[in-house]
């Protein structure tokens, strides 16, 4: 539960139609399994105690009394499981029969949530048996509870007393499929997790529709959504039920059970992440909570005592063992088809952004420094796409290679080959003499290879590009990527500056993927030479090449040895900015995700380095050139990330 992780389960138990005794044993068995797995919330299907397909038997007193007696036994069996549980059954009160979710924990029935919308169309004819629940919540006598009563109504939220933001509400099957689901109101009243007890029959194509519905609702509500539906064991007189269970979090499917086989899926929902998203989205209004009853519940042994960074003892929530995983490259889709599609989208967005800027300024030429590295290669690809969109010749792309002390043969020749294969104009301007003259002018020893030595080269290159832009009447296109901007690994008013930065919201790991995608595309189009040079650029170690090469003509200046592995930095960047993760949580999930690649000590080292750089280098980001947003994370000071340049980062370094 520490860091907001709550382990939840969606269960499809084995059942028999109208056999409450068998179903009781099956439900209790699955409850105990979920508890053993550490689940703190378990959701069972609609009408689980009796089965959904009882038909006219729902009107029989014999079945209703058996269902109620079974519920009481199941609630007794929940003692000691320390788990909030949702189970469906038919329940009669005030002369009407309701389809309800019984919500209980450790022997106490906390409430009953009746189904709001009763379907009576196609294969569904629930209105023949059940009444919809409208009106306000009310109290029901329930002598088994210590209070002697329980709550009844569909405006109930079950709120944990110890765990901030853990507020759970329920809806039942059809409630989700209507124009305005009850869960909309639940979320607006503060619920962060929705339990849906369902009995959704299978027909051709319904699986995808159901998946999209659950996934979309969790995204719309910025909520966790636990969807448990009935499966094998229901009557097959007219229908088949597949047990298609889903657990989603803010539009992301965390767990999905294969259909046509009963069983349980368990994962963790991150309620802190959901709370962060709701804080950020000011259109996510909290309203209507006055009409809700908030029912407290608590868990046993949720706290432990640990020493903090200052050596003082403090009470903290226990750490939940995690079953869920986190993508190592969060900026890149894991599925190849989706990866290829998104790569095309990103390059198109970049190109369209530049197209508008060139059309607005009336410029016909684009000036770009071409180093033979990843960033400038991607920029060149984007500029070519822009020129094609504008109907201009690619010869209007003025690619400038500016070798100096640290330029290697590999990057130099790759820049030349790339310009040739892209069909763009290449100019070579050696800046060694200019830099040496400048260093002499300021009295700097050329043998002192400090930051002045390095930055003088970067600023000289920018000056050359700016002057050429004047010469051609064109725009200098920035090549720096978002990872470099996050780390401040850019020379202020050097490569940091341009007239339009096409890579400003592209992290380094995504830059590599986009160039790799371009290589694959070139090969498909029969452009093997272009594909080969792009592939070699992808495989070239990242380096600014600002320090002199060794005797073999190779650079010993490796960027990732200075600032840390980009896969780690991009992982940190995404989870910090996108989800607002606190440092110890980010460290924890990084250790889990990269356990096979880095030691905990290495991860801690680079995480602290990331935070130090991120805060210290904001002043560079505060004056960034314009550039298009392409993903959910960007550091534009005019857009998504407005941070003061003099903010203190001590809290993130403790």
Residue spans of the language-model regions?
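Enzyme catalytic cores with a strong preference for nitrogen-chemistry domains
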Residues: 1-367, 385-394, 426
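ATP/NTP-dependent adenylation/nucleotidyl-transfer catalytic domains that generate, transfer
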Residues: 23, 164, 223, 235, ...
């Amino acid at each position: 539960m520490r860091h907001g992780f709550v382990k939840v389960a969606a269960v499809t138990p084995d059942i028999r139609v109208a056999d409450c005794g068998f179903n009781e044993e099956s439900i209790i068995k699955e409850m105990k399994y979920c508890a053993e797995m550490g689940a703190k919330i378990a959701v069972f299907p609609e009408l689980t105690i009796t089965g959904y397909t009882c038909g006219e038997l729902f009107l029989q007193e014999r079945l209703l009394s058996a269902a109620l007696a079974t519920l009481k036994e199941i609630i007794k069996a929940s003692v000691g499981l320390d788990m909030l549980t949702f189970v469906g059954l038919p329940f009669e009160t005030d002369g009407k029969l309701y389809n309800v979710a019984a919500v209980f924990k450790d022997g106490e029935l906390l409430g009953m949530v009746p189904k709001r919308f009763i379907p009576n169309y196609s294969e569904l004819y629930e209105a023949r048996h059940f009444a919809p629940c409208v009106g306000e919540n009310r109290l029901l006598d329930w002598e088994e509870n210590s209070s002697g009563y329980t709550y009844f109504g569909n405006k109930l939220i079950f709120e944990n007393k110890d765990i901030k933001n853990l507020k759970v509400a329920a809806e039942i099957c059809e409630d989700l499929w209507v124009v305005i689901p009850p869960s909309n109101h639940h979320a607006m009243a503060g619920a962060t997790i929705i339990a849906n007890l369902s009995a959704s029959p299978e027909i051709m194509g319904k699986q995808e529709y159901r998946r999209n519905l659950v996934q979309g609702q969790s995204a719309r509500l910025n909520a966790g959504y636990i969807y448990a539906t009935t499966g094998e064991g229901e009557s097959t007189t007219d229908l088949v039920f597949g047990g298609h269970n889903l657990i989603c979090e803010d539009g992301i499917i965390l767990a999905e059970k294969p259909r046509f086989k009963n069983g349980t899926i368990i994962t963790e929902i991150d309620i802190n992440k959901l709370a962060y998203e709701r804080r950020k989205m000011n259109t996510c209004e909290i309203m209507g909570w006055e009409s809700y009853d908030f029912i407290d519940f608590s868990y046993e042994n949720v706290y432990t005592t640990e020493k903090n960074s200052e050596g003082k003892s403090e009470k903290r929530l226990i750490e939940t063992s995690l079953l869920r995983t986190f993508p190592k490259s969060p900026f890149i889709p894991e599925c190849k088809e989706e990866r290829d599609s998104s790569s095309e989208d990103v390059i198109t967005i970049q190109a369209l952004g530049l197209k508008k800027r060139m059309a607005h300024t009336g410029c016909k030429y684009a000036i770009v420094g071409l180093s033979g590295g990843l960033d400038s290669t991607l920029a060149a690809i984007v500029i070519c796409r822009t020129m094609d969109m504008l109907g201009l010749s690619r010869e209007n792309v003025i690619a400038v290679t500016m070798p100096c002390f640290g330029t290697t043969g590999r990057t130099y020749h790759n820049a030349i080959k790339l310009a040739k294969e892209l069909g763009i104009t290449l100019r070579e301007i050696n800046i060694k003499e200019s830099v040496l003259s400048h260093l002499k002018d300021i009295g700097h020893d050329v043998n002192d290879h400090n930051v002045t030595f390095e930055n003088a080269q970067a600023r000289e290159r920018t000056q050359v590009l700016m002057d050429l832009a004047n010469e051609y009447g064109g725009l200098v296109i920035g090549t720096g990527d978002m990872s470099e901007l996050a780390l401040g690994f850019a020379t202020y008013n050097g490569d940091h500056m341009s007239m339009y930065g096409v890579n400003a919201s592209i992290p380094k790991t995504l830059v590599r993927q986009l160039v790799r995608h371009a290589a694959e595309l070139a090969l498909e189009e029969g452009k093997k030479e272009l594909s080969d040079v792009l592939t070699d650029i992808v495989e070239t170690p990242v380096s600014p090449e600002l320090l002199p090469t060794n005797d073999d003509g190779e650079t010993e200046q490796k960027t990732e040895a200075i600032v840390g592995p980009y896969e780690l930095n991009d992982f940190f960047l995404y989870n910090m900015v996108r989800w607002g993760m606190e440092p110890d949580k980010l460290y924890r999930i990084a250790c889990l995700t990269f356990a096979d690649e880095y030691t905990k000590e290495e991860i801690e080292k680079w995480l602290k380095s990331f935070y130090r750089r991120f805060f210290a280098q904001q002043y560079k980001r505060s004056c960034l050139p314009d550039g298009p947003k392409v993903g959910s994370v960007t550091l534009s000071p005019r857009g998504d990330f407005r941070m003061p340049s003099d903010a203190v980062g001590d809290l993130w370094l403790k």
